[in-house]
């Protein structure tokens, strides 16, 4: 206690908040030895303090010489202006870039910027030292000074008001002048008692309590009806305030008025500076600030975009723009306040003077010396107390501030170098009368001075309980007690109770099987997120750890159940979007390709898995037949699951701060599905580059499963995410459209019966840049030849597939048809079916010529019900088929060898299709679009890809590779088509970040 009393003497200290040069963005304080401030004034970025010994101290920015020290260098410590010592300074006022001073002898001095003649020296030359304004004589006893952006005002004891400087908006009340370089009297025929200059408007109060405003009329800052705004260059009375006005304060775009009973505000309030709440950002009608109408306000001050109110009890309320911490609500609270908020830091002090500037605030306060009954403060705390609510008996110097610290700023404090931490400490008292002082008054608010004679002899503090005077000092210093709070706080609450800086996690109680909804601290970036995940078993509480184990067991059980039924989960490619391209992608063609398809080995990889793929072909075929056999079982289960899978899959906004707990729960379920498929895909041989991507995906999925925290991306990652989110807004609803869910589910099951017919040699999911266009002939040749070869290689499985083809619906696309469709995307179902018809007819003709299979004819005619243009395009295709018939036989062997090699085998295709059956809650049209992206030709050139665009509508709906099948075997195709897909990833607005693909449709 004794130490704290020595830090803050009984005479009080000047507390600084915001951007003050004295302590940038860090609350600090200083005091004068054997002296006290009697006047504080804040400019845009500089400050003036007048002490009881009639000394002037200045500090802050000095670009125009506004500090009057003979130079233009900024001053970080309060510095006494020795040139004015003989004059005995009495008042000071700071404008945006100039300073006014008055002395006991009646002299008025000015220094700083003078571009509009605001120094009153008869010219427009800047001054870096104080020069006397000769207009004023000792007979003019100055009562008050005020300064605005480029304006100045002086009020005499006899009620005369003089103004000079810029009058471009009529802010000095001279109707017919643009600006004046010497003082001119402004009168309304009544003596004036108070003056305040804002940035571009001004206001004064007459002796009988009437309020007059003039200057810039925008935003309602004058408080006048529209019909009176035409005369805004002349003072006009504000009739909307019936009570007697005592004080007025003008800010950058708002005005605050103190009457005998209440406080009014009007003007611009987008930062909350009106104190009228979040639903009123501008008003020309004076409004009562209801939140503090029960408090007896004795002084008001306005900064550019914030406001401060002082009560007779010495309490301080602030509201408005919270940047730089200028509201004095704590180092962690830089948020805007839309209602008057009690500065709990000053509960142990009695506030005596306040001043608001452009980006800072100064408060002079003394320790409370007496005792006070607690009931007197009861109405003060709720609901307007600044960051926490606690009783006056619970005001320990450390806990009160620390409990309101946000996690983000607590981390910022920990990362701050030790040298900056020392700035928080109190500077030693300045020696003698030359002690430095920092006090702020806003340019648009009149300086608030406290004469020595008026220093409260019997202030409310006499009846107050003695409180620790080191209360504020300890708040300014970071204490390790915050980080080392109870284990429960650090684990469950993220070391903060600031609801704006917390998210929540649901965990399952091991004993009662209930959901515990506990807040957790959000992480700042992906690296931090991963580190926390790695240490989760060591740091989380027991319930969280048990939940993690139960989730893993549940995951294995679900996987086994799906495996027994022939239903497989497909891993969403979206999970890998948290990684940068450099971390995962290796191909030169890759730019922003989804990582799940990255492949660094190029076309050479086509020989890697050939042998192993051929060895397990029979096993894959068996699995396919089993999947078709359990169609009815899946059909019943799918009806209940179809509405949930796509919602469970995370979208690209899964890491946004505004995501709610529902999205978190859905993300956890998506992670479980991803993990299920990841474990199975390890059975298939893949290039090292792909396996690396898979490991990243598994790790990422596991981390999301262990603790589904929201992630704060770094600034670069956030920008990328935001850009992607903007592009996806238009189509996000399409992914969750459930209008055709039942129809799609039925079609999906029927489609599975077509799979045994094809070996699915080509399954890369290719996308085409919108700019690409190409001839149709070259594409048609390649398509026909590869279709013929694919059909021949699958002849041995035709017997079992005939029945399936007969039952297929008209809108189902087989895997063989999908390759051509994969190169295009159509926004209409009719357009899709036109393309489907083309492909089917080609298949029909080719099989009639080669095999004479009737079922192929049936298949080819399936989708023709959707459009008439199909037949015309089909005729052109038939001609191309006839021309290439002869060359087809020559290419058989090469194509067979090529087709047997790649990655798209029955086993992989069935897994993808089965997983899509689970996710079948998208409309049929959406699935068809995605199916059309399945690339059936691994070597289709970009020129060939252009054909597919010409035969369809524009490509605004091309989806990124994440929207296509994430086949584990896609090796060659990934590199061949990466460029086009990457372009789509970053440009097309319809690229949902969903990792959902429709293999079947």
From Swiss-Prot:
One of its GO terms (biological process) is cellular response to light stimulus. Prenylated. Disruption phenotype: Knockout mice show photoreceptor degeneration owing to autophagy impairment in the retina. One of its GO terms (cellular component) is photoreceptor connecting cilium. Residues 999-1001 form a propeptide. Residues 976-1001 have a biased composition (Polar residues). The modification Phosphoserine is found at residue 518. Residues 631-641, 659-671, 794-818, 847-857, 902-911 have a biased composition (Basic and acidic residues). A lipid is attached at residue 998 (S-geranylgeranyl cysteine). InterPro entries: RCC1/BLIP-II, Reg_chr_condens, Signaling_Regulatory_Domain. Gene3D superfamilies: Regulator of chromosome condensation 1/beta-lactamase-inhibitor protein II. RCC1 repeats lie at residues 54-105, 106-158, 159-208, 209-261, 262-313, 314-367. One of its GO terms (molecular function) is guanyl-nucleotide exchange factor activity. Expressed in the retina (at protein level). Located mainly in the connecting cilia between the outer segment and inner segment and also observed in the outer plexiform layer, inner plexiform layer, and ganglion cell layer of the retinas. Isoform 1: Expressed in the retina (at protein level). Isoform 5: Expressed in the retina (at protein level). Expressed in the brain. Expressed in the testis (at protein level). Expressed in kidney (at protein level). Residues 404-428, 631-738, 794-869, 902-925, 962-1001 are annotated as: Disordered. It is found in: Golgi apparatus; Cytoplasm, Cytoskeleton, Microtubule organizing center, Centrosome; Cell projection, Cilium. The modification Cysteine methyl ester is found at residue 998. PROSITE patterns: RCC1_2, RCC1_3. Pfam families: WD40_RLD. Interacts with SPATA7. Interacts with PDE6D. Interacts with RPGRIP1 and RPGRIP1L; PDE6D, RPGRIP1 and RPGRIP1L may compete for the same binding sites. Interacts with NPM1. Interacts with PDE6D. Isoform 5 interacts (via N-terminus) with SMC1A and SMC3. Isoform 5 interacts with CEP290. Interacts with WHRN. Interacts with RAB37 and RAB8A (in GDP-bound forms); functions as GEF for RAB37 and RAB8A. The RCC1 repeat region mediates interactions with RPGRIP1 and RAB37. Acts as a guanine-nucleotide releasing factor (GEF) for RAB8A and RAB37 by promoting the conversion of inactive RAB-GDP to the active form RAB-GTP. GEF activity towards RAB8A may facilitate ciliary trafficking by modulating ciliary intracellular localization of RAB8A. GEF activity towards RAB37 maintains autophagic homeostasis and retinal function. Involved in photoreceptor integrity. May control cilia formation by regulating actin stress filaments and cell contractility. May be involved in microtubule organization and regulation of transport in primary cilia. This is X-linked retinitis pigmentosa GTPase regulator. The gene is Rpgr.
């Amino acid at each position: 206690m004794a130490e704290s009393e020595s830090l803050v003497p009984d005479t009080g200290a000047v507390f600084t908040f915001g951007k003050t040069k004295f302590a940038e963005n860090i609350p600090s304080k200083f005091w004068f030895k054997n002296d006290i401030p009697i006047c504080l004034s804040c400019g845009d970025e500089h400050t003036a303090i007048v002490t009881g010994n009639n000394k002037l101290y200045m500090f802050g920015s000095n670009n125009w010489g506004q500090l009057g020290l003979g130079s233009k260098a900024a001053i970080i410590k309060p510095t006494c202006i020795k040139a004015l010592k003989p004059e005995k300074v009495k008042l000071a006022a700071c404008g945006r870039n100039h300073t006014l001073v008055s002395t006991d002898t009646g002299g008025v001095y000015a220094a700083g910027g003078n571009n509009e003649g605001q120094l009153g020296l008869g010219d427009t030359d800047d001054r870096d030292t104080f020069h006397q304004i000769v207009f004023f004589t000792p007979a003019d006893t100055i009562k008050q000074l005020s300064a605005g952006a480029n304006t100045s005002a002086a009020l005499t004891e006899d009620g005369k008001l003089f103004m000079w400087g810029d009058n471009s908006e009529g802010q000095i009340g001279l109707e017919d002048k643009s600006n004046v370089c010497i003082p001119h009297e402004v009168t309304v025929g009544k003596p004036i008692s108070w003056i305040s200059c804002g940035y571009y408007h001004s206001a004064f109060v007459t002796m009988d309590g009437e309020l007059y405003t003039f200057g810039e009329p925008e935003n309602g800052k004058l408080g006048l009806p529209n019909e009176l705004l035409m005369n805004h260059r002349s003072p006009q009375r504000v009739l909307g305030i019936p009570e007697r006005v005592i004080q007025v304060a003008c800010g950058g775009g708002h005005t605050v008025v103190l009457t005998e009973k209440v406080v009014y505000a009007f003007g611009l309030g987008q930062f909350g500076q009106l104190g009228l709440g979040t639903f009123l950002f501008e008003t020309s009608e004076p409004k009562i600030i209801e939140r503090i109408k029960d408090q007896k306000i004795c002084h008001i001050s306005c900064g550019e975009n914030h406001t401060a109110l002082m009560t007779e009890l010495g309490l301080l309320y602030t509201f408005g723009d919270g940047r730089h911490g200028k509201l004095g609500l704590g180092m962690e609270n830089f948020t805007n306040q839309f209602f008057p908020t009690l500065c709990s830091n000053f509960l142990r002090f009695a506030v005596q003077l306040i001043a608001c500037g452009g980006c800072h605030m100064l408060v002079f306060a003394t320790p409370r010396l007496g005792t006070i009954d607690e009931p007197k403060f009861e109405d003060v705390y709720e609901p307007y107390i600044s960051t926490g609510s606690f009783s006056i008996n619970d005001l320990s110097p450390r806990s009160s501030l620390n409990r309101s610290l946000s996690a983000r700023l607590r981390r910022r404090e920990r990362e701050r170098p030790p040298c900056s931490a020392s700035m928080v400490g109190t500077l030693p008292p300045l020696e003698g009368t030359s002690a430095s002082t920092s006090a702020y008054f806003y340019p648009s608010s009149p300086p608030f001075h406290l004469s020595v004679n008026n220093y409260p002899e019997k202030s409310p503090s006499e009846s107050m309980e003695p409180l620790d005077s080191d209360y504020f000092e300890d708040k300014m210093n970071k204490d390790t007690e915050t980080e080392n709070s109870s284990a429960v706080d650090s684990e469950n609450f993220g070391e903060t109770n600031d609801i704006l800086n917390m998210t929540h996690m649901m965990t399952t109680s091991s004993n009662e099987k209930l959901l515990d909804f506990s807040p957790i601290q959000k992480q700042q970036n992906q690296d931090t997120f991963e580190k926390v995940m790695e240490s989760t078993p060591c740091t989380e509480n027991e319930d969280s750890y048990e939940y993690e184990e139960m989730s893993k067991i549940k995951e294995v059980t679900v996987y086994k159940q799906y495996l027994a039924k022939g239903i497989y989960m497909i891993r969403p490619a979206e999970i890998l979007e948290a990684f940068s391209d450099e971390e995962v992608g290796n191909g030169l063609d890759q730019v922003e390709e989804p990582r799940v398809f990255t492949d660094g080995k190029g076309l050479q990889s086509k020989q890697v898995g050939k042998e192993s793929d051929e060895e397990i072909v029979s096993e894959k075929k068996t699995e396919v037949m089993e999947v078709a056999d359990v169609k009815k079982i899946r059909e019943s289960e799918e009806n209940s699951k179809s509405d949930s899978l796509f919602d469970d899959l995370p979208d690209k906004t899964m890491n946004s701060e505004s995501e709610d707990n529902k999205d978190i729960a859905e993300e956890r379920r998506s992670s479980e599905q991803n993990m299920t498929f990841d474990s199975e895909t390890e059975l298939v041989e893949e290039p090292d580059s792909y396996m690396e991507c898979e490991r990243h995906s598994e790790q990422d999925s596991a981390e999301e499963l262990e603790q589904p925290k929201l992630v704060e991306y770094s600034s670069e990652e956030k920008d990328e995410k935001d850009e992607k989110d903007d592009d996806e807004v238009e189509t996000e609803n399409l992914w969750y459209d459930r209008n055709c869910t039942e129809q799609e589910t039925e079609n999906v099951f029927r489609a599975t019966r077509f799979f045994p017919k094809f070996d699915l040699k080509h399954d890369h999911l290719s996308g085409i840049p919108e700019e690409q266009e190409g001839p149709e002939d070259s594409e048609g040749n390649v398509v026909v030849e590869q279709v013929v070869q694919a059909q021949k290689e699958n002849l041995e499985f035709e017997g079992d597939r005939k029945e399936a083809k007969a039952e297929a619906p008209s809108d189902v696309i087989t895997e063989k048809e999908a390759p051509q469709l994969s190169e295009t995307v159509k926004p209409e179902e009719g357009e899709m079916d036109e393309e489907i018809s083309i492909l089917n007819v080609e298949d029909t003709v080719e099989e009639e010529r080669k095999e004479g299979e009737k079922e192929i004819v049936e298949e080819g005619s399936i989708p023709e019900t959707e459009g008439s243009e199909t037949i015309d395009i089909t005729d052109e295709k038939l001609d191309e088929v006839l021309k290439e018939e002869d060359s087809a036989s020559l290419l058989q062997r090469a194509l067979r060898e090529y087709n047997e090699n790649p990655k798209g085998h029955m086993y992989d295709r069935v897994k993808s299709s089965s997983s899509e059956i689970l996710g079948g809650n998208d409309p049929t049209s959406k699935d068809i679009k995605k199916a059309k992206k399945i690339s059936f030709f691994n070597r289709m050139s970009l020129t060939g890809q252009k054909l597919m665009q010409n035969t369809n509508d524009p490509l605004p709906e091309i989806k990124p590779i994440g929207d296509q099948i994430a086949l584990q075997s896609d090796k060659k195709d990934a590199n061949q088509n990466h460029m086009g897909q990457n372009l789509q990833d970053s440009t097309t607005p319809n690229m949902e970040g969903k990792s959902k693909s429709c293999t079947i449709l």
